[in-house]
Amino acid sequence: MFPSASLEYSPNKKHDFKVYSFRKVSRPRYNSVNPFQIFQSTFSTIEGDPKLLPATRYYIAGGYTYNKMYTAELFYKKAKNGLASLIFQNNDNNLLQFISSNLDENVAYGIDFTINKSFSKFYNCYFLASFYNETSNFKNPTTNIEVDQQQFSWFIRNSNSFSFLSDQSLSADINLFYSSALIAENAIFDAFGAVNFMMRKTLCNKQLSVSMGIEDIFNQGNQFNTRNYQDQSGTSLTKGENRLFVASLRYKFGNSKMRDNKKSKRVDERNRI
């Protein structure tokens, strides 16, 4: 049994209270339980663990929404045997090992603030700020000793949509994301963020759409993390193609304004009944 429950109370149109909870189970994939050691490069390997256990996640939250636009929500989540790919340095063999493992326990609690409001006919804003404390426990395979990590983290996400022209056929989106240092698996990631910009123009009675934009304008989405505990002292930098110019062209084929072809007819005989 994996029960989910929710309770909502709205005394009037402007106030809404909600409490909900759920429990989920995730099972390891085949490549995570593969016991063979695969060399990714001369000095790094990928390893599975056939003894992996299913992961169980619990989540409970309660919040208040005012006027369907402003929300504050407290949450608590706990994961047992979380599935993760942990990075360890084998100092004896000079290898960097990516090992599929179970995190013993991961607990986080905090508060979310959300604003979702149309300030005018031409401007809509979504804003999310989350503040939480997280602890993670796992076993170091090289020493067989428990490792405890703790971190207070926060992040913000902001989406701004603008509409231009009388028919609102021209629009622009500016999206921002920023995260402070956070725990992920057996590493602590430094702060990172990104700013995206997109413009869209619709033509031909909204059947044709042309979009252009830039993702991660300031190229700040690279993620640097450290692993400093017991016999581990390592760093990693995830450097991808973050800053991108994107363009798209879409056209809706067919009749996008289908009408009901149901015919109505007047029967004179009915008027006499």
Predicted feature locations:
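Residues that define the transmembrane beta-barrel architecture of outer-membrane proteins
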Residues: 1, 56-60, 66, 105-109, ...
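Outer-membrane beta-barrel translocator domains and adjoining extracellular loop/strand segments
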Residues: 1, 30-37, 43-45, 77, ...
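Residues on the lipid-exposed face of transmembrane beta-strands in outer-membrane beta-barrel proteins
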Residues: 5-9, 60-66, 111-117, 131, ...
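Outer-membrane beta-barrel strand-turn architecture
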Residues: 9-13, 56, 66-68, 78, ...
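Transmembrane beta-strands of outer-membrane beta-barrel pores
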Residues: 21-27, 37, 68, 76-80, ...
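Outer-membrane beta-barrel signature, preferentially recognizing the C-terminal barrel domain
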Residues: 25-74, 78, 96-110, 116-118, ...
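Outer membrane beta-barrel strand-and-loop segments of large Gram-negative receptors
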Residues: 72-128, 137-157
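Conserved C-terminal beta-signal and adjacent last beta-strands/turns
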Residues: 149-273
